[in-house]
């Protein structure tokens, strides 16, 4: 397309009735569009307490699906146990939905009633 622009400019330069700016741009004003970028909405992945899922299983889930180290996974597991729920992480919607689905599927396959859901952050 650059070659076509040069051909047009050359053609327009040959026309006596066409005025040009000093830079040879033939009076064409160009404004760059700057898109207004916004951060995507974020979602919390929340684990809920139940009376049947072993604490070790919850720690394993936090290590495997949320990449938490043993110490942090244990702290989150204790928060789930004592407060009834805890946030495992905050992600974009697609990632949060995928993680919650993976945790719920793994819990069902392991025959545990552990529940994981997402909530809009903020």
Swiss-Prot record:
One of its GO terms (biological process) is protein catabolic process. InterPro entries: ClpS (IPR022935), ClpS_core (IPR003769), Ribosomal_bL12_C/ClpS-like (IPR014719). Pfam families: ClpS. SUPFAM superfamilies: ClpS-like. Signal peptide: none annotated. HAMAP family: ClpS. Binds to the N-terminal domain of the chaperone ClpA. Belongs to the ClpS family. PANTHER family: ATP-DEPENDENT CLP PROTEASE ADAPTER PROTEIN CLPS, ATP-DEPENDENT CLP PROTEASE ADAPTER PROTEIN CLPS1, CHLOROPLASTIC. Involved in the modulation of the specificity of the ClpAP-mediated ATP-dependent protein degradation. This is ATP-dependent Clp protease adapter protein ClpS. It comes from Pseudomonas fluorescens (strain SBW25). The gene is clpS.
């Amino acid at each position: 397309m650059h070659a076509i622009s040069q051909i047009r400019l050359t053609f327009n330069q040959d026309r006596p009735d066409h005025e040009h700016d000093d830079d040879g741009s033939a009076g064409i004003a160009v404004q760059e569009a700057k898109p207004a970028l916004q951060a995507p909405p974020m979602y919390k992945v929340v684990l809920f307490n139940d009376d049947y899922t072993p604490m070790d299983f919850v720690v394993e889930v936090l290590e495997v699906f949320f990449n938490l180290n043993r110490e942090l996974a244990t702290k989150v597991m204790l928060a789930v146990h004592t407060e009834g729920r805890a946030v495992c992480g905050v992600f974009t919607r697609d990632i949060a939905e995928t993680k919650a689905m993976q945790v719920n599927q793994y819990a069902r396959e392991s025959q545990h009633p552990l529940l994981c859901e997402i909530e809009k952050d903020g």
